[in-house]
């Protein structure tokens, strides 16, 4: 998933998010990780596709959230180009944690007719993991016990035991962040 901010028709790439799901049939999102890894050539090709798509759709101001798929042959398919912030803690939390850019402030500034501020980019790793199962809860408890400094935000509830077939069935989430990519990635779904 690709996050951009636009001002006067100029599109600034902010973040690339890796998405984890349950797979078919529901594709319920289980986690997101930033920054996602992609080779530099593919990164530039996708930036070009997203920028041209934003132009074609007439998106000149504000946030945008784009979902694309790159197949094994390198073909890029557009799933969604939306004039909105990414949900599930992407726009509200992960972008700022991984880049240092106050995305929410920028969106508000643009809505008020003010140019968004420049920023000094920082590199950090962050993830949101959703609670769907007892295993997810066990991972949350293990982090809370052994690495509580990684937890940035949490909203965790008792697991109902019912199958999770949509995002609204999840029993909460926790956000972790740090400078060690592998330390964050090890808490993501396989």
What is the role of each PLM region?
Residues 106-190:
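Peripheral (often C-terminal) accessory segments that flank ATP-dependent C-N-forming ligase machineries
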Residues 1-76:
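Internal nucleotide-binding/catalytic subdomain
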Residues 78-80:
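Pre-DFG segment of protein kinase catalytic domains
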Residues 45-66, 72, 82-135:
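Active-site "cap" helix and flanking loop/linker of ATP-utilizing ligase/carboxylase catalytic domains
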Residues 26-27, 87, 164-169:
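Short, flexible turn/loop "capping" segments at secondary-structure junctions
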Residues 24-25, 89, 185:
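Short helix/loop capping segments that flank catalytic or ligand/cofactor-binding pockets
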Residues 39, 43-46, 100, 181-184:
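Generic structural signal for well-ordered, non-membrane alpha-helical segments
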Residues 6, 17-18, 82-83, 133-135, ...:
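A broadly conserved detector of short glycine/acidic/proline-rich loop/turn motifs that flank catalytic sites
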């Amino acid at each position: 998933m690709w996050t951009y901010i636009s001002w006067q028709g100029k599109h600034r790439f902010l973040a690339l998010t890796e998405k984890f799901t349950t797979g078919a049939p529901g594709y319920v999102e289980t986690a997101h990780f930033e920054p996602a890894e992609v080779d530099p050539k593919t990164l530039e090709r996708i930036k070009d596709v997203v920028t041209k798509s934003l132009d074609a759709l007439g998106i000149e101001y504000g946030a945008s959230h784009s979902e694309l798929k790159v197949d094994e042959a390198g073909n890029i398919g557009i799933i969604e180009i939306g004039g909105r912030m990414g949900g599930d803690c992407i726009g509200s939390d992960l972008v700022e944690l991984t880049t240092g850019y106050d995305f929410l402030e920028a969106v508000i500034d643009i809505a008020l007719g003010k140019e968004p501020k420049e920023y000094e980019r920082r590199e950090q790793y962050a993830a949101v993991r959703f609670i769907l199962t007892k295993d997810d809860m066990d991972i949350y408890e293990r982090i809370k016990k052994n690495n509580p400094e990684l937890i940035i935000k949490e909203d965790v509830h008792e697991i109902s035991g019912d199958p999770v077939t949509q995002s609204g069935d999840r029993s909460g989430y926790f956000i972790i962040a740090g400078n060690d990519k592998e330390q964050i990635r090890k808490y993501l779904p396989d």
